[in-house]
């Protein structure tokens, strides 16, 4: 590989790493191309990206950036998953993919510059995703006005029942 090609790969990796709050280093040794393609598709669906890269190029690209804590841990065959939208969704996609593949392993990762081992990444994958949290927050915010409207409607209904009872009482007398 020419020096200019290496520089281009390093710049591309650096751009991905700087834009991504999460980076996860995986082992893909012995995986067929079809399985890697399925992994890439699954990650794209969850807002991520998967790159197979030489260890030295990854070390250079990650040095001095958000995921600097990863640079000293690269060994053997590595692939790096970057997630730019929802870190939890990327972690979930990787953990789910690992369940279906005997050759795929999650080694370690970085979330906003904090080193995460595979057990911490498993715990991250169990958290609710961004969309789920937004839905819960909106549901909670929507509950207050809904409850107010129901309370007000009940007050009006009870007031009307009281007026109707008074009217019936006067008509009977």
From Swiss-Prot:
Keywords of the record: Ribonucleoprotein, Ribosomal protein, RNA-binding, rRNA-binding
GO molecular function annotation: large ribosomal subunit rRNA binding
Any one biological process term the GO annotation gives: translation
Tagged with keyword Ribosomal protein: yes
InterPro entries reported for this sequence: Ribosomal_uL10 (IPR001790), Ribosomal_uL10-like_sf (IPR043141), Ribosomal_uL10_bac (IPR022973), Ribosomal_uL10_bac_type (IPR047865)
SUPFAM superfamilies: Ribosomal protein L10-like (SSF160369)
Cellular component GO terms, alphabetical: ribonucleoprotein complex; ribosome
Pfam families assigned: Ribosomal_L10
HAMAP family: Ribosomal_uL10
Function: Forms part of the ribosomal stalk, playing a central role in the interaction of the ribosome with GTP-bound translation factors.
Assembly and interaction partners: Part of the ribosomal stalk of the 50S ribosomal subunit. The N-terminus interacts with L11 and the large rRNA to form the base of the stalk. The C-terminus forms an elongated spine to which L12 dimers bind in a sequential fashion forming a multimeric L10(L12)X complex.
NCBIfam families hit by this protein: PRK00099.1-1
Family in the record: Belongs to the universal ribosomal protein uL10 family.
Name listed for the protein in its UniProt record: Large ribosomal subunit protein uL10
Taxonomic lineage of the native organism: Bacteria, Pseudomonadati, Thermodesulfobacteriota, Desulfovibrionia, Desulfovibrionales
């Amino acid at each position: 590989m020419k020096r200019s090609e290496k520089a281009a790969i390093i710049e591309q990796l650096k751009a991905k790493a700087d834009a991504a709050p999460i980076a996860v280093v995986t082992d893909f040794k012995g995986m067929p191309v079809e399985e890697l393609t399925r992994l890439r598709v699954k990650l794209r669906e969850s807002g991520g990206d998967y790159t197979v890269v030489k260890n030295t190029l990854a070390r250079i690209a990650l040095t001095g950036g958000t995921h600097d804590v990863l640079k000293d841990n690269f060994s053997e065959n590595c692939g790096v998953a970057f997630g730019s939208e929802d870190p939890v969704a990327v972690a979930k996609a990787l953990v789910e993919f690992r369940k279906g593949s005997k050759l795929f392993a999650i080694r370690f990762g970085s979330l906003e510059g904090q080193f995460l081992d595979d057990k911490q990444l498993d715990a991250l994958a169990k958290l609710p995703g961004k969309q789920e949290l937004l839905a819960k927050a909106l549901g909670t915010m929507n509950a207050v006005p809904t409850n107010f409207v129901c309370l007000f409607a009940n007050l009006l209904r009870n007031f009307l029942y009281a007026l109707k009872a008074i009217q019936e009482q006067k008509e009977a007398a």
